[in-house]
UniProtKB/Swiss-Prot annotation:
Tissue specificity of this protein: Expressed in liver, testis, kidney, heart, pancreas and brain. Highest expression was seen in the brain. Localized predominantly in the perinuclear regions of neurons from the cortex, striatum and hippocampus. Colocalized with HTT in the medium spiny neurons of the striatum and the spiny neurons that project into the globus pallidus.
Top-level taxon in the UniProt lineage: Eukaryota
Domain called DHHC: residue spans: 437-487
Gene that produces this protein: Zdhhc17
GO molecular function: identical protein binding; palmitoyltransferase activity; protein-cysteine S-myristoyltransferase activity; protein-cysteine S-palmitoyltransferase activity; protein-cysteine S-stearoyltransferase activity; signaling receptor binding
Subcellular localization(s) per the UniProt record: Golgi apparatus membrane; Cytoplasmic vesicle membrane; Presynaptic cell membrane
SMART domains named among the record's database cross-references: ANK (SM00248)
ATP-binding found in the keyword field: no
InterPro entries to which the protein is assigned, alphabetical: Ankyrin_rpt (IPR002110), Ankyrin_rpt-contain_sf (IPR036770), Palmitoyltrfase_DHHC (IPR001594)
EC main group: transferase
Listed name of the protein: Palmitoyltransferase ZDHHC17
Biological function: Palmitoyltransferase that catalyzes the addition of palmitate onto various protein substrates and is involved in a variety of cellular processes. Has no stringent fatty acid selectivity and in addition to palmitate can also transfer onto target proteins myristate from tetradecanoyl-CoA and stearate from octadecanoyl-CoA. Palmitoyltransferase specific for a subset of neuronal proteins, including SNAP25, DLG4/PSD95, GAD2, SYT1 and HTT. Also palmitoylates neuronal protein GPM6A as well as SPRED1 and SPRED3.
Length: 632
């Protein structure tokens, strides 16, 4: 096992033993630091208690503490051993108990007078430092209950939060912040926890967690003025670079040598980092002319461009095709101009962080031109009572359900800053601060069936999926409206297809029965290119809407699961998954599933089970027995 300046883990025959570790050392020459693909902590998991029969009577108290032999330790202490006495390596019993996570011995030694913040070892560290380096959250909690001070620094100038950040112990970072540690605290080397995480931990956490606590992203260290983005580039930490840029990391921030993060990336000839940082500059308009820079800096304007572009493109495609021009060369040049315009808008104004803006714009534009076509092309040709009136009624229902799907709260799990910290402390002190049930971005305990949406960056109760066509997540708060949206949208598209076919029958000369299908397609496309273009759009949307509606109905009715649960069932312990089926604890039969989902009451005939999924943390909730409905 490699040695580092302070700690070592002797794993062949025993538990952790203290030597040296390079954890937190002054980094005075960053140009000498080579990118790392990972960081070896120099630790293994400590061995558990010995389970085989052994003669502990000859063991000294240090070895007995390392292995957690409580009776032997108590025997020696009762015989007069001073629990404050350090061994030949200047390490106390409390240090050994802390690094090996012997909570019962920590309680015992403190009850016998052990000093909770006693310094020891080559690094002059406290037991809390040792427990933090090893990632023993339960030990950190226990020591702090006895008054251990996490703000004390060790011989290398690091407090506990810096150690937890650089070793990737996200739960400990969260607990320390919740207990009052400053998220921007600098160690004696001028490094913040975010800088250490960016340099040492090649995963999304704890960087993501620190960013959620509103850490100062663009703060520079004391000696080199390197920001966290500089340190991430020095380490080749591509995962963290993306997170820092999304959080507003300044690509042009310079250190004492006048170097930006992009300059460091170029020095290391890392193509991915260079491209990513250059894209970030372009997204902020730094490399654009001044008149474009102001527009590009306006996020609301960029969103309007993304929403408005599909309106223009859909119209131009149909308009150019419908022009009375025989030369396809001219039309081809016009289409080339449309393509060039879209490329310019995309490169100059599209914001790829607005994932839903473009699909939402495509949906709104398609429906807008379909309604224009309906009222200006079909209105005089179709029967009002049997066609137009049902179409208008369907449209009202469609607009209502779309609006609710788009703008309703899908089930965002909310908490105040104090509630978040209280949750972290409660989970940590009950041994439940596990990232499988705790969201390191939203800083909340995740209810059952919830999931963090990577697009919206929020935890959603009873999460189904993120739908780009409505620009929102689909969850407990709007899933029923989303089903209504799909249902009425499908009928609207069917009416549109009917209108197109009726128009061709009335206004176009066709010879389908004589010349066949392909000749018919040519005739209707030539007769009215705009109508044919609307027909193609209708068919495209019909296909995905029909498939999605059927899948949703099947999952809701027959399986009792969400799309997320169906795709990730193996990740959840409460699902029984075989090669052919998924058994859901939320499936209560087709009838009951429908009644509960749509909350059917039928004038009191049915009594659906209403569950607040934003606060439901177990699979057990008050259910109505029987077939899923109850006569009242």
């Amino acid at each position: 096992m490699q040695r580092e300046e302070g700690f070592n883990t002797k794993m062949a025959d025993g538990p952790d033993e203290y030597e040296t570790e390079t954890g937190c050392v002054p980094l005075l020459h960053p140009e000498e630091i080579k990118p790392q693909s990972h960081y070896n902590h120099g630790y293994g998991e400590p061995l558990g208690r010995k389970t085989h029969i052994d003669d502990y009577s000859t063991w000294d108290i240090v070895k007995a503490t390392q292995y957690g032999i409580y009776e032997r330790c108590r025997e020696l202490v009762e015989a007069g051993y001073d629990v404050r006495q350090p061994d030949k390596e200047n390490v106390t019993l409390l240090h050994w108990a802390a690094i090996n996570n012997r909570i019962d011995l920590v309680k015992y030694y403190i009850s016998k007078g052990a000093i909770v913040d006693q310094l020891g070892g080559d690094l002059n560290s406290t037991p809390l430092h040792w427990a933090t380096r090893q990632g023993h959250l339960s030990m950190v909690v226990q020591l702090m209950k006895y008054g251990a001070d996490p703000s004390l620094i060790d011989g290398e100038g690091c407090s506990c939060i810096h150690l937890a950040a650089q070793f990737g112990h996200t739960s400990i970072v969260a607990y320390l912040i919740a207990k009052g540690q400053d998220v921007d605290m600098m160690d004696q080397n001028g490094m913040t926890p975010l800088m250490w995480a960016a340099y040492r931990t090649h995963s999304v956490d704890p960087t993501r967690l620190l960013l959620t606590f509103n850490v100062s992203v663009n703060l520079g260290d004391k000696y080199h003025k390197n920001t966290a983005l500089h340190w991430a580039v020095l380490a080749g930490n591509t995962t963290v670079i993306s997170l820092l840029l999304e959080a507003g990391g300044n690509v042009d921030a310079q250190n004492v040598k006048g170097e930006s993060a992009l300059d460091l990336a170029k020095q290391r000839k890392n193509v991915w980092m260079i491209n990513h940082l250059q894209e970030a500059r372009q997204a902020k308009g730094y490399d654009n002319p001044s008149f474009l820079r102001k527009l590009k800096a306006d996020k609301e304007f960029r969103q309007k461009v993304m929403l408005g572009t599909p309106f223009l493109v859909i119209w131009l495609v149909g308009f150019i095709a419908d022009l009375d021009i025989d030369s396809w060369l001219i039309k081809g040049l016009m289409y080339g101009g449309v393509w060039a315009t879209v490329q310019f808008l995309s490169k100059s104004f599209f914001d790829h962080s607005m994932h839903s803006a473009l699909p939402l714009g495509i949906y709104l534009a398609t429906k807008f031109w379909m309604y224009v076509t309906w009222f200006f092309w079909f209105w005089n040709d179709l029967n009002f009572l049997f066609i137009h009136l049902p179409f208008l009624a369907n449209s009202v229902a469609l607009f209502y359900n779309f609006g609710k799907s788009w703008k309703s709260d899908p089930g965002i799990i909310k908490a105040t800053e104090e509630q978040k910290k209280k949750t972290i402390v409660e989970l940590a002190e009950t041994g439940s601060l596990d990232l499988s049930i705790f969201c390191s971005t939203c800083l909340i305990r995740k209810p059952v069936r919830s999931k963090h949406c990577g697009v919206c960056n929020r935890c959603i109760a009873k999460f189904d999926h993120h739908c780009p066509w409505v620009g929102n997540c689909v969850g407990a708060g709007n899933h029923r409206y989303f089903m209504g949206y799909l249902f009425f949208l499908l009928f609207m598209i069917c009416w549109m297809i009917y209108g197109c076919v009726s128009y061709w029958g009335l206004h176009c000369e066709t010879t389908y029965t004589k010349d066949g299908f392909w000749t018919y397609i040519t005739q209707i496309a030539t007769c009215s290119p705009w109508m044919f273009w609307m027909f193609l759009n209708s068919v495209f949307h019909f296909l995905w809407v029909a498939v999605l509606l059927m899948c949703q109905l099947y999952q809701i009715t027959c399986l009792g699961i969400t799309t997320n649960e169906r795709m990730n069932a193996r990740r959840y312990k409460h699902f029984k998954v075989t090669t052919t089926s998924i058994e859901s604890p939320f499936n209560h039969g087709c009838v009951r599933n429908i009644i509960d989902f749509f909350e059917f009451r039928c004038c009191g005939l049915f009594r659906p089970v209403i569950v607040d999924w934003t606060r439901q943390y177990t699979i057990e909730y008050d259910q109505i027995s029987g077939s899923g409905y109850q006569l009242v």
